[in-house]
Each structure stands twice: as C-alpha cells, then as structure tokens.
Amino acid sequence: MELEGRSAGGVAGGPAAGPGRSPGESALLDGWLQRGVGRGAGGGEAGAYQPPVRLDPESGPEYEALPAGATVTTHMVAGAVAGILEHCVMYPIDCVKTRMQSLQPDPAARYRNVLEALWRIMRTEGLWRPMRGLNVTATGAGPAHALYFACYEKLKKTLSDVIHPGGNSHIANGAAGCVATLLHDAAMNPAEVVKQRMQMYNSPYHRVTDCVRAVWQNEGAGAFYRSYTTQLTMNVPFQAIHFMTYEFLQEHFNPQRRYNPSSHVLCGACAGAVAAAATTPLDVCKTLLNTQESLALNSNITGHITGMASAFRTVYQVGGVTAYFRGVQARVIYQIPSTAIAWSVYEFFKYLITKRQEEWRAGK
C-alpha cells in the first residue's frame, strides 16, 4: 500500500492505519515513517515534504538496520538461546565425533559411520549414554555464545564502517568472527575439556563434578585450558571461513537482509560444512589435548601432551597422515545442522526481540 509522506503536522491523510490493521501495527508503522522522514531521503531537514513511501506491511523495514532496535542485549540473548539449542540438539552427534577421532580406539569402539556408532552406543551402553556431559555443555554454551554473537555484530559494523563505509566488507566479517572467537573459547574451553572426557568410551566419569574434581587434583587448573591455543588455532580460521561464507551467501540469497528463515538455514548449513571440512586436522589435535587419550600415551609417549606442536606430532606418530582426518564425516554431519540451527535461531530471536522493542517504543 502507499503511505503519504509526513510533514511537521503529521502524516497526510491521517495515521498509518488501514483496514484489518491493529492499533499496535499502525503505531509501529507510524514510528518507522517518522524516523525515516526525520532523516530525509535526500538529506533534507525534518518537516520537509517527502515523496510517498512504500512499505510492505508483511515484511516491514530491514530488521538488521533498525537504528535503535538491535542492542547488545538483543544479540546476547539471541546468541545464548541459539548456542544452547545448537549444542543440545546436536550433542549425540558430537559424542560420536569425539569417539571417532580417537587415535587408538578400543575394539568395541570402532565405528564405520555415524549411524552405526549411535546405534551401538545406545544398545551397549544405554539409551542416554550419548547425552552424558550435556549439562556442562549447555552451561558453557549460553554465556560463550552470548559473548560471541554480541562481539561479532558490534565489530562487524564498526570494521565495515572503516573498511567499506556504507557497505558490507568480507574482511570485516572475517576479522569480527576471529575476535569473537577469542571470547567464545575463553568461556567454553573448560566445558569442552569436561565434556569430551565424559564422552570417551569407558570414561570413568559419570557426573560432571567427578570429572572436574579429578582433572583439578591430578592435572591442575591449567588442564582446563591446555587446549586453548589449539582451540583458537582451529576456531579462528573456522570462524573466519564460517562468517565470510555465511555473509557471502547472504548477499546472494538474501541481498535485502530481511528476516528470511530459509536463507538463514541454507547459508548457515553451507558455511558450517565448508569450515568444518577445512579445519578437521586441528579438531583432531584439540580432541587429543582435551582427552589426553591414554592408549596413545601408553604407546610411545610419556607424560602429558601439551601444545599444538606436540599434538600434531603424536597424531602423526600414531596414525599417519590419515589420522588428521579421523571423524571428518561426523564433524561435517554435525556442523551442517548445527550452524543452520545456530543462525536460524539467532536471527529469529534477534528479529523477535527487535520487533518487540520497536513495538514498545512506538506505543510509548
């Protein structure tokens, strides 16, 4: 429908009301018009007549560009919900990935593919065995993803304004993703250590507190961050590839950057698959550092494995070049729906929260 431009006295023809539109919707559209005209399409002063503005009442304005809607709190809440849901839904596959990355697995824990692994784990170890350690993962994922998305959105906008004013910069997207990863991994690394030790075959830990206590007493507090540098070495390129691929695909499938669930799912899934396959060798080394796999240690290594270089040498000594790609199938299968869930849930909650904030402001 066509809505006349606003003058100093109001919208010509009355408020942005129409048949079938509630007072709240009318107030919301009225607020959008007021902000748009106040700025002036051609840089004119507020109060000058503006040409007719066409708005699609179904989609509204570009939700990512609302001037005061998407606050840091919005990104943090949306990111926390997305992170928790992502990890909870995909946790059984993550358990399989950890086991398939084992360098010298027990004969009872040698799996041909993801489905066989899940079936055998549930049949021989119990229906809920693939979910062991989920509670500590969810506890870490909430704050980690809140920091992650809030930092990413803030830096993406700041760097894009510097590198490519008025446009979108792939370099800014990649750099923002890298910096956001520093905060995410700092919050998530201890939970990763505990989670992966509980996921291993014949793990002696049945409760999170048992695992935390044993690691603290036997290896010290530093064990919770032993894999931090390797995690960063893996996640920084992973997130750079991930964010750059996602934003690149969004430019093609959703150039107007409106809330579009199908584009968020598709772009997130593709970005996750590409990034996961490219960084699998680093993920194998991270798993070794987190678990300190006893069979690998007993074979030809003494003491604890510390640092990325040591992990790379150990992986090669035990399994050769092919060992760097153990679990690549499970990792890609995990990341495709995982990143699709994360982006779609994050964008949905960002859209929902922003819309509610705008409705509240318009009704004041």
UniProtKB/Swiss-Prot annotation:
It is a multi-pass membrane protein. Ubiquitously expressed at low level. Expression does not vary during erythroid maturation. Keywords: Ion transport, Iron, Iron transport, Membrane, Mitochondrion, Mitochondrion inner membrane, Repeat, Transmembrane, Transmembrane helix, Transport. One of its GO terms (cellular component) is mitochondrial inner membrane. Residues 18-27 have a biased composition (Low complexity). InterPro entries: Mitochondrial_sb/sol_carrier (IPR018108), Mt_carrier_dom_sf (IPR023395). Residues 1-28 are annotated as: Disordered. Belongs to the mitochondrial carrier (TC 2.A.29) family. This is Mitoferrin-2.
